[in-house]
Amino acid sequence: MRIVVFSERLRAPYDEGIKNVAAHLMAALAAEHEVLALTSQGVDDARLGLRNVDSNRMLLSPQLGGLIRRFQPQAMLYAPTACATPFAFARARVLRRYGRGARTALLTLQPRRYTAWGRAWMRRLAPDLVLAQSRRTAGALAALGCHTALLPPAVDTQRFRAATSEEKAGLRARYGIPGAAQVVTHVGHLKGKRNLAQLLELQAQPGYHVVVVGSSSTEQDTALKEALRGAGVTLIDAYVERIEDVYYLSDAYLFLAEEETAAIEVPLSVLEALACNLPVVSTPFGGLPDFFAEGSGLYYWHAQTELKTLVRAALSAPCATRGLVEARTWPAAAAALVTLLGSAPSELRGAGL
């Protein structure tokens, strides 16, 4: 199949959720299909076959339109950095016109709220298919008249795996982390909405050590950084090429965000930690409960529960979290996407789980 994949502002490093998902889908689709990977306000990437094209904010561009028309796509995927907004729907309509009516899907990885004006325009501009990663978001968009489906989450299960005891010890020595400590980790944006202040209490517990890795491509909360460092947390606020090493040196992973826009709806860091067979303590965030039931080392934390008690239980119980994601690879997600792109609207109900 000839598929156009478009997402704005793509440039390495792909250490932010939407960019990361778009880049992985480009690569996975290109392994089996003929793919034209495009971005605007980004940078060419030969490894992905990604081409940066000049355009305005509404994607009105003779160059972009010409590239897509000459490619003669059979399907198109648009992963907007703004997710499902009225203007993103309008841009999807522009892309569809460039593709001469090729079936067009818009991928939204975060929920959005709409005014009455926005809802009215979205009903008029809806693309052929909207892919979401939570039942709630899919349902909200279906109520606006969109054909929706769930795109299964994915992780690189070859890159992210269980660490050996030797690897763990060596990495702790390299990063200056106490070898005998119970190490709990968080990877993602250094922002207050991630609820990272909760980690200060854990750092104060005897025998515990907290590691936080902040995204280098997003704005960081300076006061939060100072508080974490002041408490003795190991804080890494630069890009880490081998992010898997941070999971390998850890004993558990924590994701404590509660605000719905704090991350993409199925946070990649949670999937990566599961693939590394770490116990994971997470809020029931976004689409996580839609795809993963609690158990096997995955614990859902609610604010009324004492965090340190739940973390202690997670660290002391058997763990088999890798089994939760072993089949959820990027090639599998790409294959599911191609199936959804070829499905009639009547076949989409409940699709993607």
Annotate each language-model stretch with its function.
Residues 294-305, 312-316:
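Conserved acidic donor-binding segment of nucleotide-sugar-dependent glycosyltransferases
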Residues 4-6, 178-194, 200-207:
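Conserved donor-binding/catalytic core segment of Leloir-type glycosyltransferases
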Residues 222-241:
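Nucleotide-activated donor-binding/catalytic signature segment of Leloir-type glycosyltransferases, i.e.
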Residues 255, 275, 279-282:
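Short hydrophobic beta-strand element within catalytic cores of glycosyltransferases
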Residues 127-166:
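Donor nucleotide-sugar binding/catalytic pocket of nucleotide-sugar-dependent glycosyltransferases
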Residues 305, 315-345:
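A charged, aromatic-enriched C-terminal amphipathic alpha-helix characteristic of glycosyltransferases
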Residues 255-271, 289-290:
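Nucleotide-sugar-dependent
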Residues 40-43, 187, 209-222:
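Glycosyltransferase donor-sugar binding loop
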